[in-house]
Amino acid sequence: MIVVKIGGSVVCKDASKVIQNLPKYADRAVVIHGGGCLVNELLKRMGIEPKFLTHPGGLVSRYTDWETLKVFVMAMGWINKYIVASLHGLGVQALGLTGADLGVVVAKRKERVLVIDERGRQRVVDGGYVGKIAEIRVDKLTPPPLKVLAPVAVSEKGELLNIDGDQLAFDVAREAKAERLILLSDVEGLILGGKVVPRLTPEEAEKLVKSEEVRGGMKRKLLMASEAAKLGIEVVISSGLVDSPIDAALNGAGTHIIKNI
């Protein structure tokens, strides 16, 4: 099995090339998507300014209060069904899910989180409606049909929760014992010194996470990739905006994080 994560940057720019490439892998893939840019757009239309939290180590997450949660679920629902409908137009039977459907992804709500405030001090704040994944029913994700999964989980109390899409992709890949995890974004891979880094070991990825060379979402991707590679899963970070992006990733494009290079 392969796990394909369609990043929000791809979803909001042009996901058509990924979608057109998916029929080739419909019998052995699970698709997970993001869509934070649409969440931001809808929030601003409603007069709500998106809020983000910076955590120790430089990782950034969305602060999700009740109103933001409603917009988050709405945006992810639209993206999910857009992908499913597009696949239907290509003759692929696909099933769009959130983690709440069939209890596919159960998470525990983070009631408190540690953040770095604007003065650089650590403090504990309310966690909002953000979850830490506790269980994935991977048997419900096995094709056929091709499953398209949104990063929305359910708690044991029946709460809808925002979960990180990259973390979800990693957890699905781990539980499914996937051969490869493909993270598609709007960049060609990890770029250092103006060039794409073609190969990394898990240890090299970990060092970069701790350095100042890598920032934002790439830091989280490398952290997840390092953990996955240690389990024997090959991780590819590459562009979802090129022709046949899944083919390209499997044929050497992007940055490959592999246990033994």
UniProtKB/Swiss-Prot annotation:
Chain positions recorded as substrate binding sites: 35-36, 62, 162
Keyword vocabulary terms for this entry: Amino-acid biosynthesis, Arginine biosynthesis, ATP-binding, Cytoplasm, Kinase, Lysine biosynthesis, Nucleotide-binding, Transferase
Gene3D superfamilies: Acetylglutamate kinase-like
Residue numbers marked as site, Transition state stabilizer: 5, 221
Gene Ontology annotations of biological process type: arginine biosynthetic process via ornithine; L-arginine biosynthetic process; lysine biosynthetic process via aminoadipic acid
Annotated pathway: Amino-acid biosynthesis; L-lysine biosynthesis via AAA pathway; L-lysine from L-alpha-aminoadipate (Thermus route): step 2/5; Amino-acid biosynthesis; L-arginine biosynthesis
Catalysis: reaction(s): [amino-group carrier protein]-C-terminal-N-(1,4-dicarboxybutan-1-yl)-L-glutamine + ATP = [amino-group carrier protein]-C-terminal-N-(1-carboxy-5-phosphooxy-5-oxopentan-1-yl)-L-glutamine + ADP; [amino-group carrier protein]-C-terminal-gamma-(L-glutamyl)-L-glutamate + ATP = [amino-group carrier protein]-C-terminal-gamma-(5-phospho-L-glutamyl)-L-glutamate + ADP
SUPFAM superfamilies: Carbamate kinase-like
Name used for this protein in its record: Putative [LysW]-aminoadipate/[LysW]-glutamate kinase
Species, as recorded: Pyrobaculum aerophilum (strain ATCC 51768 / DSM 7523 / JCM 9630 / CIP 104966 / NBRC 100827 / IM2)
